[in-house]
A protein has these predicted regions:
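Non-catalytic cap/lid and distal C-terminal segments of serine-dependent acyl enzymes
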Residues: 1-247
Length: 247
């Protein structure tokens, strides 16, 4: 499998930010890591090998980047306003740095990636997707949480509202973003298990909000033996690649 690593200094995040790509060409998928992990996490946990059929045959090309979870949501020493500032900066990094890089890497065509994330990465993927639906063709959200108020120690602000998908989606009124989500042909896949450390209520809540807004989506709730762990994600992600990019 072709594998290339690039990095550049991000003025938004004040640090070098690496990005790894897998495959030669094909529709792009932007993969955001779980919790405190880094851009090579999907490779270390052997997920990329399960996608070789698509990545080696030009059916898809995958990109993975670092997150800011250790600076933001998972940083217990940081005040809520600072956490939200990091999330805003990360949103700018993804939309104004990573997406242009992917476009250039794909030959300059106006590509719209699928964005994917697992666990806290699913939150990051959902947030950038629902805030900028015109920039993406779909989202694959695995075992995620879509309400970050539990990380905010009771803090309330406009910045929290606009970075909390269950809030701003529930109140989304007729407008460009809602029409894009309703009629833009997006593929939204929400996955959860019901086993150890999974919380299917979070995925059902997001799906319920999308349904109430007439936003097409797919909710997959797997069994009570399906835990919040890599063996199950290695099983479901190839299935979703098959749905998105063909077998």
């Amino acid at each position: 499998m072709r594998r290339d690593i690039t990095q550049w200094y991000s003025e938004r995040l004040y640090r070098d930010m690496p990005i790894v790509s897998y495959g030669h060409y094909g529709p792009p998928v932007l993969m955001l890591p779980t919790a405190a992990a880094d851009f090579l996490e999907y490779e270390r946990f052997q997920l990329m090998g399960t996608l070789a059929h698509w990545l080696d045959n030009g059916k898809a090309k995958a990109y993975s980047v670092n997150s800011v979870n250790t600076l933001a949501l998972m940083n217990k020493q940081t005040k809520p306003r600072e956490k939200l500032e990091w999330l805003k900066r990360y949103d700018g990094y993804l939309t104004e740095e990573v997406l242009p890089f992917i476009k250039n890497d794909c030959g300059g065509v106006d590509v719209k990636p699928v964005v994917m994330g697992i666990s806290l990465g699913a939150y990051l993927a959902a947030n950038v997707f629902f805030r900028h639906p015109e920039r993406f063709s779909g989202a694959v959200l695995l075992s995620g949480t879509y309400d970050i108020r539990g990380f905010m120690k009771g803090h309330q602000s406009e910045d929290l509202y606009f970075n909390n998908p269950v809030d701003y989606l529930a109140n989304m009124q007729d407008g460009r973003d809602l029409r894009e989500l309703q009629h833009g042909g997006k593929r939204i896949i929400i996955f959860t298990g019901q086993g150890a450390y999974e919380d299917p209520a979070r995925s059902r809540q997001l799906a319920g909000i999308l349904g109430s807004k007439g936003i097409p989506h797919q909710l997959d709730v797997w069994g009570q033996d399906v835990n919040h762990d890599w063996p199950w994600w290695r099983k479901c992600v190839p299935q979703y690649f098959g749905q998105l990019f063909g077998t």
